[in-house]
Design a protein with these regions (language model features):
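Surface/interface-facing alpha-helical segments and adjacent flexible terminal/loop regions used
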Residues: 1-193
Length: 193
């Protein structure tokens, strides 16, 4: 059984890898971090009693090339892509997700810049903020943020990705996102008992 501190560091590493994947999938080291995130997520899933067979199968897959992942990313999520990575484009979220996220980042003393080239409510930014909160050893704030933001629309995003025939690598990423939602829900249930 992992200690809560170790569990939070594991969650932090997964969210950090997902932030990189959904902001710059072609950057050096991103796919290796993805592979590590799959392993860590499988371990976390096992800890909370979630079956790991699907993640174990993902671990066995060879890594694609950065170029193929970038091309698929552009096809799915680019300006003309059919799937949005912005919370503001999904139902069930707050009135102005971008402004709400910006406020949350500022409350956490994080500078908000457009250096990364993505809006504040972009999935990569949300995952990055989760990683920061967990790294700062503030899991309660991370869980509240997850429940208010990505947790509200990730299931719909997962379905949208899976419904796209051109999704190959990101179909696997959707599986990882789905498992993360299950892990987060399981962690909340465990706290309530």
């Amino acid at each position: 059984m992992a200690t809560p501190l170790l569990e939070n560091y594991a969650r932090q590493s997964v969210f950090d890898a997902l932030a990189a994947l959904f902001i710059r999938p072609d950057a050096a080291g991103v796919l290796e971090r993805w592979a590590d995130a799959v392993k860590v997520t499988a371990a976390l899933a096992g800890e909370v009693g979630i079956p790991t067979a699907t993640l174990d199968a993902l671990r066995e897959k060879p890594l694609p090339t950065a170029e193929s992942v970038q091309a698929e990313y552009e096809t799915l999520f680019g300006e003309e892509g059919p799937v949005s990575l912005l919370e503001s484009d999904w139902p069930k979220t707050c009135d102005d997700p971008r402004a709400t996220c910006r406020l949350e980042y500022l409350k956490a003393d994080l500078a908000v810049t457009d250096e990364l080239g993505v809006p504040e409510d972009h999935l990569g930014m949300l995952c990055g903020f989760m990683a920061v909160l967990l790294l700062r050893e503030n899991p309660d704030a991370a869980e509240r943020f997850f429940d208010r933001h990505p947790g509200k629309w990730l299931p719909a995003l997962v379905d949208a990705i899976r419904n796209r025939p051109e999704a190959v690598f990101f179909r696997d990423a959707a599986t990882l996102l789905e498992t993360i939602c299950e892990i987060e829900a399981s962690l909340r249930e465990a706290k309530n008992y």
